[in-house]
Amino acid sequence: MDSQPSWTHVHEQNRKAWDRLVDQRNRFARPASDQDCHDPLAAVDGLGWLGGNIEGKELLCLAAGGGRQSAIYASAGARVTVVDISPGMLELDREVARERRLDIHVVEASMDDLRGLTAQSFDIVIHPVSTCYVPDVVKVFQQVARVLKGGGVYISQHKSPVSLQATIKPGDAGYVIQSPYYSKQAVPKVSGTSLREEGCLEFVHRWEEIIGGMCRCGFVIEDLVEPMHAKPESPRGEFGHRAQFIAPYLRIKARRREQAVTPSSDSNHGELWLPQ
């Protein structure tokens, strides 16, 4: 089977951007700490969505290079594979695996093209905030559905659509919507903010695409939260101030259906897509 990714200009630009962010020691390019690995599930699963024990589970860290996610889940006893588009980010995973003597399988690929991974081979997929870097989020969900076992858990995080649409700094009228909701174009680039990754192309995904797309790809959503980052005392225009008005991201717990479910006759979306 051909395992080479199908690069587009979006993939290539974001790949290069993340390699630069590694060189700049971006906050997402910092490997797990001793404290993280000492009590790993406390570091990443405060909501208890993983049930308190992942020993021996086949776990995919998707679009999650950087040496943190993979090391934490491997320290918790999971058999970890980490996928990322950036060679620089993946090198951090290799380094932390050597330093901590962890068994971590590293794969360079895009989240929307996992042809190099075996179907139904994972019990858990962990997917940090990253779907904004691909134009079509449904392709990502299709790939996850293919590699996840029936009954498997998919925990993902996504930038809020309105957060990507809105201005980073407030004007006289406060934070305003500047990018259209129905658009396939990348949002305007900005710099100097933790809400965006400099040099990357990012795309707004509608709620229908995130929630509906996930359901139509064979998942049942079990929980959804918007982590609280609002800080009333934050100066105007700072991250905590903006978060009072706009949730920066959401976290979803979904489970892969064991069997196909036939869509209702009044569905406007055609047949349910099922992984092969």
Tell where the protein language model's regions lie, with residue ranges.
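Conserved class I S-adenosyl-L-methionine
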Residues: 153-189
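A short SAM/SAH-binding and catalytic strip from SAM-dependent methyltransferases
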Residues: 123-138
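Short alpha-helix
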Residues: 201-225
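Conserved alpha-helix/loop element of class I SAM-dependent methyltransferases that forms part
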Residues: 30-57
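A short acidic, Gly/Pro-enriched loop at the edge of an enzyme's catalytic core
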Residues: 112-125
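A short glycine-rich, Lys/Arg-flanked "PGG" loop and its adjoining helix->strand segment in the class I
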Residues: 138-153
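N-terminal, positively charged/glycine-rich alpha-helical extensions of SAM-dependent methyltransferases
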Residues: 1-32
